[in-house]
Design a protein with these regions (language model features):
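Canonical positions in the second alpha-helix
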Residues: 69-72, 105-106, 140, 190-191, ...
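Alpha-solenoid helical repeat scaffolds
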Residues: 80-85, 115-119, 151-156, 168-172, ...
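Short coil turns that delineate tetratricopeptide repeat
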Residues: 74-77, 111, 145, 196, ...
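Primarily the internal scaffold of c-type cytochrome electron-transfer domains
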Residues: 216, 244-247, 251-275, 282, ...
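Alpha-helical linker/edge segments of TPR/alpha-solenoid repeat scaffolds
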Residues: 92-97, 126-133, 163-179, 211-220, ...
């Protein structure tokens, strides 16, 4: 455990020195942006103080410096990392209660920290905090199966550390389950598989094997302990003597290790890609006419459209103006933008609801996104890149657009979530797609064979009449993974064997996608309390919610792309006129207690579940959308960071009140 702690301390801390990722940009494997998390800290003294934590070698020095940092800079962007350092050094100094307190606060700000979760799970198991140990170990294993290697480690280093983390997590969970008198052989087998050199794992497994009357396996494990552990050798010899059978004790348990590893590497079961591939949305129309007609009206279908005059929502009239003279708009048979005396015609539109971007296509196949977009609610042109990028963004300089750089290229930056079946041809900037917008098969899978067999009414292959990906049969995690193809900012994109970018031609329809660690992104994407500030992280927020983690909620619990009322219900909400119905099927105890529970009159907007549990605090450029973290309101982090960096939902309506009032109200509500 001590070696594991030392191995990950620098991993977590030095991550703040690494290149960070812009928000709202495709995340490609081995690709980072040109600024660091630490460089975004404006206070130079604060940055210097944090560097002293990184440079501390002695646990006592690191403990002192980290505690000094959190005391002096209680509102720092780096609190998650600083409290992480407090927790790890406190464990080394046997300050276990303080380690748990600091570690839990760090995880509150950044829950997706598997190495810290592993350390706390082991400590909690040791202290008989079994429920917490099981929860933390399980969360760590979940994240380790999703998050790619930290960018400050090379693949070899991560390949060495990750098995240790997984082994330690399985061991902690097994130890906690064992203390609850639960049989935990499966987790111990996996722990031994990931770390076949740890005698403590084999010792605990021997005890479980004895409980199960598996004397042969127990003897083999005890023999391994006797040979490899000075600390446990005497206990192992005593137990072997009691067993009284040395005939098979010296054979090492290779069989169980190999089997556990094979079990661990099996991929989730998803419907397989069909050989005949993709049919296109029109193939769905004859059998699914209502769904097809409804989909055609949605923002998904119209995410990217070839230019048609009736699709334009921007103001290209003579009175339409941008705030700068660097660019002007006009209309000459079709809309155009003029920058540095060069004219760029609109060939495609991006978006169709409250905001619209414009694309010009070059003769060589590249599609370039004009820097300004039109915001319909405010009826104004905005510099999109300037609003979402950190200061100094090159693509936000309108006068430089005629350089037509990769930074403003549609295929490289936007197409993976705005078009269907995207494939890189000769270069990423010239990638081609089968369908503009998001079509049926992006969600339901490749359907050529399905459509062909359905058209024939072929009963020889009844399985073909089922959709390639059936949401009715999927778990909530499988279903969310489909939506996450476009709605998860942190997804790391890798090309398929034939340069496919957002679809598969063989293997699993929705393959497991690695996620870039969240602390590798620009601080502009977060509030200081750790919640997501930008709407591009909507799946990341939702997968933190108890509704997803402990329940069965998925995107389709509340949304549907097949509703007929899209013109008036642009959020595709299933219960547009009665939003509480999204929550009450699971939380039925509140159905007749809405006013009592919400402390607002039943039927009022304030009494709706989403008003308190999904507040409008997330940026969508010029307006706010609802957070999808779905949490119980608190006030303590607002007291620490302030309303701007930790919005309290009560104060978003009761603006005349203060945070002390909010805390008192929430305390009374809980009591």
């Amino acid at each position: 455990m001590k070696m594991l702690r030392e191995g990950v301390v620098l991993l977590l801390l030095t991550g703040c020195l690494l290149l960070a990722q812009d928000a709202d940009t495709i995340v490609l494997k081995n690709d980072n942006q040109k600024f660091t998390i630490l460089s975004q800290i404006e206070n130079r003294d604060e940055s210097a103080a944090f560097l002293t934590i990184i440079n501390a070698v002695d646990p006592a020095a690191r403990y002192q410096r980290a505690n000094s940092f959190v005391s002096k800079y209680p509102q720092s962007w780096l609190l998650a990392q600083a409290y992480d350092a407090v927790a790890r050094s406190a464990i080394d100094l046997n300050k276990y209660a303080e380690a748990l307190t600091a570690g839990r606060f760090s995880l509150r700000l950044l829950p997706e920290n598997p190495s810290l979760l592993v350390l706390l799970a082991n400590l909690e198991a040791q202290k008989s905090l079994s429920a917490k140990a099981i929860a933390d170990a399980s969360a760590a294993l979940d994240y380790l199966d999703q998050i790619e290697r930290p960018p400050n480690m090379n693949q070899r280093e991560w390949n060495s550390l990750k098995p240790q983390l997984k082994a330690s997590a399985y061991f902690a969970r097994a130890r906690a389950e064992f203390s609850q008198a639960a049989v935990s052989l499966s987790d111990l087998n996996k722990a031994a598989a990931w770390n076949p050199e740890d005698p403590e794992i084999f010792y605990l497994r021997a005890i479980v094997e004895l409980r199960l009357q598996n004397k042969r396996e127990a003897s083999q494990d005890l023999a391994f302990v006797r040979k490899n552990s000075t600390l446990l050798r005497e206990k192992a010899e005593h137990m072997l003597a009691l067993l009284g059978d040395q005939g098979f004790a010296d054979r090492l348990p290779e069989r169980k290790i190999d089997a556990a590893l094979r079990q661990e590497t099996i991929k989730p079961s998803y419907p397989q890609i069909l050989a005949q591939g993709y049919a296109g949305p029109d193939a769905c129309k004859s059998c699914h006419a209502n769904e097809y007609a409804a989909w055609r009206k949605t923002g998904m279908a119209r995410m990217l459209q070839p230019y048609k005059r009736e699709n334009i929502i921007g103001d290209f009239s003579p009175t339409g103006r941008f705030s700068s003279d660097e660019i002007r708009m006009g209309f000459d048979k079709r809309p155009f933008f003029e920058i540095a005396r060069q004219r760029f015609y609109v060939d495609f539109t991006i978006g169709s609801k409250w905001q619209q971007g414009y694309v010009t296509k070059l003769p060589d196949g590249r599609m370039q996104v004009i820097p300004i977009e039109y915001n319909l609610p405010s009826k104004q042109w905005i510099n999109y890149w300037e609003m979402i990028d950190p200061p100094g963004s090159a693509r936000a300089v309108i006068a430089d657009f005629p350089k037509l750089t990769p930074a403003t290229n549609y295929q490289q930056n936007c197409a993976i979530c705005h078009t269907s079946q995207l494939k890189s041809s000769e270069s990423l900037e010239k990638a081609v797609y089968l369908q503009p917008g998001i079509d049926c098969e992006m969600c339901h899978g490749p359907s050529a064979w399905h459509a062909k067999q359905a058209a024939k009414g072929n009963l020889e292959h009844p399985d073909s009449l089922e959709p390639p990906f059936d949401f009715r049969q999927a778990t909530n995690r499988q279903a969310v993974r489909v939506c996450a193809q476009c709605h998860r900012q942190s997804a790391v994109r890798e090309f398929g064997e034939n340069a496919e970018m957002n679809y598969s031609t063989k293997g699993d329809f929705v393959p497991v996608t690695w996620l870039r660690p969240y602390d590798a992104f620009s601080r502009k994407a977060f509030f200081k309390d750790g919640r997501f500030r930008e709407s591009t992280f909507i799946v990341e927020a939702f997968t933190r919610s108890a509704c997803y983690l402990k329940g069965t909620a998925q995107c389709a619990t509340c949304h549907s792309p097949h509703l007929a009322n899209f013109e008036t219900n642009q959020k595709s909400l299933k219960y547009w006129n009665n939003p509480n119905e999204m929550c009450l099927p699971c939380h039925s105890q509140f159905r007749d207690r809405i006013a009592e529970h919400s402390r607002h009159a039943a039927g009022s907007e304030a009494s709706e579940c989403v008003s308190c549990h999904m507040p409008r605090i997330v940026n969508a450029l010029l307006f706010k959308v609802r957070s999808h973290q779905i949490e119980i309101p608190t006030a303590d982090l607002t007291e620490r960071f302030g309303q701007a960096d930790s919005p309290n939902v009560c104060l978003t309506c009761h603006t005349e009140k203060g945070v002390t009032w909010a805390r008192e109200q929430l305390t009374a509500w809980r009591n």
